[in-house]
Amino acid sequence: MSKARSQDEVGWKRNESLCEYSMHRSRRPIQEKSIQSRAEHNFTLTRAYAINGSMTPDSSNLHHSSQVAVGRDAEGSANTLNTPFSEACFSQLISDGARSYLDFDFPDETIPGTSQAKNTEPDHQASGLQNQMSCDSLRNNTIMLDWLDLDYDGNLRQYSTAQLYGLLGADAHNGSAKCTLSLLPERMVADKAEAKLLLNHKMYGLTALCKNADRGSRRQQAVWEKVEVLLSSKHQTCVSDLLRKVDSSGEHQSLDLTSLPIEKLVQRAFRELGGLNLFIKEQDVTRIQERFLDPEKLPVDVSDMSLLITSLAWGALLDPEKLQRCYFARMVAFLCLAEKTGSDNLPALILGSISTAASLSLHLETALRKSCVSNDQAVQTKRAMWILYCIDKSYALRWQTFSLVGDGSLPTTNPPDTALPSEVATTLSLEWLRIRSQYSKICSNILQLGVGAEGEPSENRSNRAVVLSAALEEWYGSVEISQMMLSLEHSDAVHMKLQTSYHYYEARFQLLSISLPDPRSSSPTGSQECREVLRRSIREVITGSNTITSEYLLQDCNHLFIQTLALSMLALDILLESDQGCGKENRALLSIVAGFFARVDIILPQSSIFEEVSNLIEILTYR
């Protein structure tokens, strides 16, 4: 028996009360007998979960870091890895064939015989795998939300969203306690993953056109290498990451919350169109703030602290009631903030929000009503589902990946358009949500066109692209958008115009990358029409960059991306020229782009995007 164990090199230990597992990685592929049947491991996202115990760790027992909350079925028996995150991951891995998660490689596992010392303490033996597959764990007095993802090399790796425990410090002086908050960037856990989602799919359309335009030349290769860097998800600018590096000196390691204009920050966050005022109430975060700053109150829970932190960062105000529904609202709030800042955790937050909504069956009216204690909460949850839908479609369109939220995942066919009696300033936000939902449906159709573009006849593909182009033009020039801009103040109207134009041009560029014919095609007329539309779109985006203020650049990373995308399309258009030259108009556009990114470099000196842009412009202009 010991011989068989040494052959498989797999140790399995289970504790029924804690659902603990221990696995030692095999140096050889797992034998065929370890592969489980597909039906046995085919998890479903729509399963309801009952969390055993509180998500907040017991502060009196901080040394027991191996204790985590695990999924349990209705009867109370512990399930293997049944959490929304893990089931979403494994259900995708088993879609094409049965494969046991025993086959995966765990790089953080200690292997006997290596230079690492083998720890034989019982606590370490029992926590080998659970620390890698926990949905909520405690590390160094820090509460972590962890999940698993599959790397490009086929290995499961662990990722963490943020450290939410241990952020508070109390400086006792003369009998009074002073609440301080450690500098957020220093407490955030950056995503260390090197593999990004489906980058090759993002590059496919433009790469093919570029290669056909200037096949094999050194100039083309140099240009496309720079374009790949600028457009890759790995090199996208994350505003929060850059601000983190600006000043990390020791004298700024803590922040006195009482010195912040908390009320002003919250009120400003709730004024933003289509923001968190759709599904969160402003007075809820005010109550959390008062409870946190009042020395007579009990310590604030970790979950409430995360709500306050998010509200100060962007106004992510969450429901303080201890309901499952508020966990979904919290994740959508983080998702909104991640979209604005360009966080590389965005795909993980999308997946987490979707799996949480599915586990709570929020797409079903009866289940949604059961999860909410009032009609107001039910309406806010429906809005949050639609916000998740819109963000998912925009992300899928940008990186040409598959969309995770379908129309059947929504509780209603259209976003709720009725303002609640307690709401005052959400009417315009509701209008903006309705406008963006219409755009998201167009994105879904563009994605379907892109998926079938390779095997579809060019004539059918062009006809479908024309129909989608007309729908996009109708949306951009709709009466709803015009009327909404007239009802806004000047600054808000400018901000909304930028947002709608960015959505429009990003979808336009995606349609052009699909419908642009091969330069060697026998249909020069159609090709010329697409080229004219491409040039006009590039010109409008680049010349409009002077309307983007420095404040806007720090508030939304999409300002940077759309200008980067326009520059990349301009590089493609220059390479498509038969004489491989750079005309007068193109030189002028390149100069405007250089000025825009020079301004970005001044605002965000830690960013390397200006250097990359300068190198690309030099290649296009002088080589």
Swiss-Prot record:
Pathway entry: Mycotoxin biosynthesis
The UniProt record lists the keyword ATP-binding:
no
**Keyword set for this entry?**
Virulence
Relate the induction remark in this record. Expression is up-regulated more than 10 fold in toxin producing cultures.
The residue range of the signal peptide is none
Which residue ranges are recorded for the region named Disordered?
110-129
User: Is-annotated flag, keyword Nucleus?
Assistant: no
- Other facts noted in the record for this chain: Gene clusters encoding host-selective toxins (HSTs) are localized on conditionally dispensable chromosomes (CDCs), also called supernumerary chromosomes, where they are present in multiple copies. The CDCs are not essential for saprophytic growth but controls host-selective pathogenicity.
Task of the protein = Part of the gene clusters that mediate the biosynthesis of AM-toxins, host-selective toxins (HSTs) causing Alternaria blotch on apple, a worldwide distributed disease. AM-toxins are cyclic depsipeptides containing the 3 residues 2-hydroxy-isovaleric acid (2-HIV), dehydroalanine, L-alanine which are common for all 3 AM-toxins I to III. The fourth precursor is L-alpha-amino-methoxyphenyl-valeric acid (L-Amv) for AM-toxin I, L-alpha-amino-phenyl-valeric acid (L-Apv) for AM-toxin II, and L-alpha-amino-hydroxyphenyl-valeric acid (L-Ahv) for AM-toxin III.
In its UniProt entry, what is this protein called?
A: AM-toxin biosynthesis protein 12-2
Native source organism of the sequence: Alternaria alternata
Tell me what gene encodes this: AMT12-2
